[in-house]
Amino acid sequence: MVRAIVGANWGDEGKGKITDMLAKESDIIIRFQGGSNAGHTIINNYGKFALHLLPSGVFYNHTTSIIGNGVALNIPFLAKEVDDIVSKGVPKPNILVSDRAQILMPYHILFDQYEEERLGKKSFGSTKSGIAPFYSDKYAKIGFQVSELFDEEALKEKVLSICEMKNVLMEHLYHKPAIDPEELFQTLLEYREMVKPYICDVSKYLHDAIKEGKHILLEGQLGSLKDPDHGIYPMVTSSSTLAAYGAIGAGIPPYEIKNITTVVKAYSSAVGAGAFVSEIFGDEADELRRRGGDGGEYGATTGRPRRMGWFDAVASRYGCRIQGATEVALTVLDVLGYLKELSICVGYEIDGKVTKDFPTTAELKKAKPVYTTLPGWNCEIRGIKKYEDLPENCRKYIEFIEKELETPITMVSNGPGRDEIIYR
C-alpha cells in the first residue's frame, strides 16, 4: 500500500513529524521531489533534527529510505547529512538513491546566488540552494544523471560542452570567474565515490516491493501553494509539490497511491516573497512567531523568520483539493493555547466581491481577508491523548476547520514530540 504525505499550504506544515510517526508502521519512505532547499524538523529520542534531503524515516532500523528520481540530488549534502545523524547516535540508515536521479551541480548553487543578487529587490526569496537552476537544466536536457558518472569518457566530454555554455552566462551576465571544466570533472568523480554504495534501480525495487505488499510512504516537500502549476506563481518552487507527482518522482504507477494524508497547519506561516492574504504583523505576529513551531517559526534551511498569519480556510481548502486529500493531519494546535480568540480567514474580498475560491496570482494580490472569530481555549493542551479530553473551544476550532476543508481531520498534533498526536 502506498501513502503520500504532502502539505496543503506554503510548506513548514509539520510533514516531517507526521512522516516520522507513520514510518514506524512502514517499510519504505521515499523523497520524490525538491532538494535541500527545505527542511523537515523531527524531535525523537535521539534529539532534534532538521532533515533536508534524507527521508524522515531514517530513524527506524526496519525502514529503507529512498531518494527518488525526482529529487535534486546534492551529493555532498547527502553524505554530510548521513554523517550528522550517525554522529548523534542514530544507527546508519539503509539508503537507496535512484540511478535516474539528477545531480545538483556546484554551479547550480552559484547561479542561484548570483541571480538573486542580480534581481535585487525583485528577487524571489530563494534559499540559494540551486534548485531553480537545477530544474531548469533538467528540463533543458543538460543535466547529469547519477548513472552518467560511470562512463568517464562521455562524462568528460559532456562537462566540457556544458562548461562552455555555462561560462557565457558566468562571465557576461554575472561577471564572475569561469567554471574550470577539469576541476568540475574531478569533483564529479568524487561525487561518484560518495553515492556509489546507494545507487539502485529504484522503480524496479518499488515494483517488487508493491507486489510483496510492502507499506510505502511518499514524503513530499513544501506545500500546494508552492507548486509551479497550481501555486502562487511565480513565487513557487521548481518541482511539483503535489501527491500526483509522487508517482513520477518515485517511479510507481499513479493508481498505487491509495491514501493522501495532507498536512495542514492550525495557523499560517510562509517563508519568502508572495501574496499572503491572512498575514499579520507587529507584536501580534512576533508573539505567534516566538511561540510557534518547535522553538520559534524560523526557516529550517535559511533561519529566516517566517511570515505569520491566521488560519486561511480558502487557501487550505484549495491546497487539500489539488492534493486530492483523503484525510488531514492538523498540526501545531498547541501553539494557539495562549489566545483568547482566534481569527479564521473564510473568504477573500476582491474588487468589492467576496469569494471562497482561491484565485490566480493576479487576483490574489488584490484580495483582502474576510474573517470569522472563534473563542480560544486559553490553556495548555500538550499531554492530552484523547480527542474528547480537549477543551470544548479547541474541539470547536478543529471541527470548524474540518467543515471548511471539506476533508476529515483524522490526526491532531498537540506538541512537537513524536508521540504528541491525537487520533480521531
Language-model regions, residue ranges each:
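Non-transmembrane, aqueous-exposed alpha-helical and coiled segments at domain scale
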Residues: 1-424
